């Protein structure tokens, strides 16, 4: 799908556009943060709310606005967000596209607001503050911790269950699976390696 087709379909979880760059940086930087916390996205300048390609004003210095955007993202956001900025002509209108890549060090946030108040996510075509649930999920993702690795202390680790899992996994893997392998897979965790995880409970 071309950029023109994307814009004609309207704003989305991965697309937002403005006729010009808002004077208040926070009005657009939170969208950059939200894109980095999600699937990435494009922030396009030169398109109005009616999806018309009005282009940037001829008086705008493209190099200057690119530098301004890059500096603002670098100074206002934490951790460092990966992005690129390109210029494109569509229907004789000069557009500027900030392509934000999905980050793997979530949560990304506006430094001046702090992590709790400065973390944003995309909900449909809107940018919203991340609530505590979303913030926790982003934090876990940034630490590369997933649901099946969470401790599940309500489930007791039984020797018979360990033997069954080792036997079942050995048949599937066509090699001997030991208790140590289950520990390495975070199926059981803890200082004494005797705490079940959600993966253990599910299996």
Question: Can you describe what each PLM-predicted range is?
Answer:
Residues 1-203:
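Conserved N-terminal catalytic/coupling substructures associated with nucleotide/phosphate chemistry
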């Amino acid at each position: 799908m071309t950029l023109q087709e994307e814009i004609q379909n309207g704003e989305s979880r991965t697309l937002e556009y403005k006729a010009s760059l808002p004077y208040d940086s926070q009005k657009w930087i939170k969208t950059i943060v939200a894109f980095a916390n999600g699937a990435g996205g494009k922030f396009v300048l030169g398109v109005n709310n009616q999806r018309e390609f009005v282009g940037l004003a001829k008086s705008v210095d493209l190099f200057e606005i690119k530098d301004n955007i890059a500096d603002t993202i670098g100074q206002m956001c934490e951790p460092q967000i990966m992005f690129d900025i390109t210029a494109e002509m569509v229907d004789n209108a000069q557009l500027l596209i900030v392509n934000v890549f999905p980050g793997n060090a979530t949560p990304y946030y506006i430094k001046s607001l702090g992590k709790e108040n400065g973390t944003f996510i995309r909900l449909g075509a809107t940018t919203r503050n991340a609530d505590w649930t979303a913030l926790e999920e982003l934090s876990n993702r940034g630490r590369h911790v997933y649901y099946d690795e969470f401790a599940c202390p309500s489930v007791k680790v039984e020797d018979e269950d360990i033997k069954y899992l080792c036997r079942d996994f050995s048949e599937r893997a066509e090699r001997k699976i030991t208790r140590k392998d289950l520990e390495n897979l975070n199926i059981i965790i803890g200082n004494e390696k005797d705490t079940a995880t959600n993966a253990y409970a599910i299996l």
